[in-house]
Design a protein with these regions (language model features):
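Soluble FAD-dependent oxygen oxidases
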Residues: 1-262
């Protein structure tokens, strides 16, 4: 984001950037919508695609601890073009799994390489070699299609309650607790997620915008996704209990898109 145009509460039209109203620009980058009505954004674009190399590989839950330890070491030195997410739960996908594996506890590694697809296939290959996968849907696809690949998992009308915290480190103890909470989810549709951070996110200094987590290596997301209103209490409690437990591995800050304020 290079600049923002907005109308303030007193009707003044302003342009905010690093050189024009820089304090306002600082707040707009992460501080929400309380500064005025934004009428325009100026972004610096970067060419990606049209096709990218992607990874989506599923492993049995009993491999989560060892794989997260290997994952931690790999992403620390991975190319900047690699972004990834580990999510653990039952993941009952009818298209990917037969009846025997559909309701088995498992986890997935999803990744993308924002560069040459041939180079990306090589860069993402370690994610596919952490053990014997239950399913592997990795391959090349249009970048815009990859951006939508999880949309169908979150239909309108479902019940959702999510929270998050930035992790100071993906320590062995933190990994053990992630295993525990993934197995304890009351809904088969719920997941515990580990998001890889760093890269361009960390290029911006911690004090250069109103956005927390610039220096965090990982984000923990806890997603309760369920259908039965009678299960509200159990699912909300699971999320809150998980975050209360995982707070010892965090400075207490969170990603506002996964805030779960209620």
């Amino acid at each position: 984001l290079r600049s923002v145009e907005l109308v303030t509460a007193d009707g003044e039209f302003l342009r905010a950037s690093e050189t024009e109203h820089p304090e306002l620009f600082w707040g707009l980058r992460g501080g929400g919508g309380n500064f005025g009505v934004v009428t325009g954004f100026e972004f610096e674009l970067h060419t990606v695609g049209p096709e990218v190399a992607t990874c989506l590989v599923f492993y049995p839950a009993d491999r989560l601890g060892p794989v997260l330890r290997s994952y931690r070491e790999f992403v620390a030195d991975a190319p900047r073009e690699v972004s990834s997410l580990v999510f653990a739960g039952e993941l009952p996908d009818e298209e990917l799994f037969d009846a025997g594996d559909r309701h088995r506890q498992k986890f997935a590694i999803m990744g993308c390489y924002a560069g040459d697809p041939d180079e990306g296939a090589v860069a993402l290959e370690p994610f596919r070699q952490f053990g014997d996968p239950l399913a592997d849907a990795s391959g090349r696809m249009p970048y815009v299609e990859f951006q939508q690949v999880l949309d169908a998992d979150y239909p309108d009308g479902m019940r959702y309650y999510w929270k998050s915290c930035y992790l100071d480190d993906l320590s062995d103890e933190a990994i053990d607790r992630i295993e525990h909470w993934a197995a304890a989810a009351p809904s088969p549709l719920s997941t515990v997620d580990v998001w890889q951070l760093g890269g361009a996110i960390a290029d911006v200094g911690v004090d250069e915008s109103a956005f927390r987590g610039r220096d965090a290596p990982f984000l923990l997301g806890v997603e309760a996704n369920w259908e039965d209103p009678d299960a509200d209490e159990a699912n909300v409690a699971w999320v809150r209990d998980c975050l209360a437990d995982m707070g010892r591995f965090s400075d207490g800050s969170l990603y506002l898109n996964f805030a779960g304020f209620l």
